[in-house]
Amino acid sequence: MRVELGTISLHHFEGRVMAQSITTLTSANFDETIGSSDLPILVDFWAEWCGPCKAIAPVLAEIATEQAGKITIAKLNVDDYGDIAMRFNVMSIPTLIVFNKGEAAKRLVGAQGKGKLLQELAEFLPT
């Protein structure tokens, strides 16, 4: 079960509810959000019809909860905001781009497991 309320999503996993903040990006807030963040931002370029995108959603939700205050997790729907996807040369989804200090610093294409994602994000997370 998933209910979206602004930037707060509630996910139901194995009988418990986990809440975390996942930022929804649009053309109106993308540049300001990326440019003004003190934290690294992992942007998930996704679409509603994309099976692998749906498969990694719970993984991103877990990371958002576990790494709160260390990294921001954000999502951008490529069907709604294709201009931004084109700007960052997103050709396949899911594409995950880590923005650090306003710049695209790392790109991952395809569904990733939690361990692999955390390994890829380690250089951006405080120790």
Where are the regions a protein language model picked out?
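Short, Lys/Arg-enriched N-terminal segments with co-localized hydrophobic residues
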Residues: 1-17
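A short beta-strand-turn-helix
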Residues: 22-41
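Conserved Rossmann-like nucleotide-binding pocket used by diverse enzymes
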Residues: 26, 46, 72-74
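Short pre-active-site segment immediately N-terminal to redox-active cysteine/selenocysteine motifs
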Residues: 38-39, 45-49, 92
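Conserved helix-turn-beta segment immediately C-terminal to the redox Cys motif
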Residues: 38-40, 55-76
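Conserved redox-active cysteine motifs that mediate thiol-disulfide chemistry
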Residues: 45-59
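Structural microenvironment flanking redox-active thiols in thiol-disulfide oxidoreductases
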Residues: 78-85
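Non-catalytic, surface beta->alpha helical segment in thiol-disulfide oxidoreductase systems
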Residues: 97-127
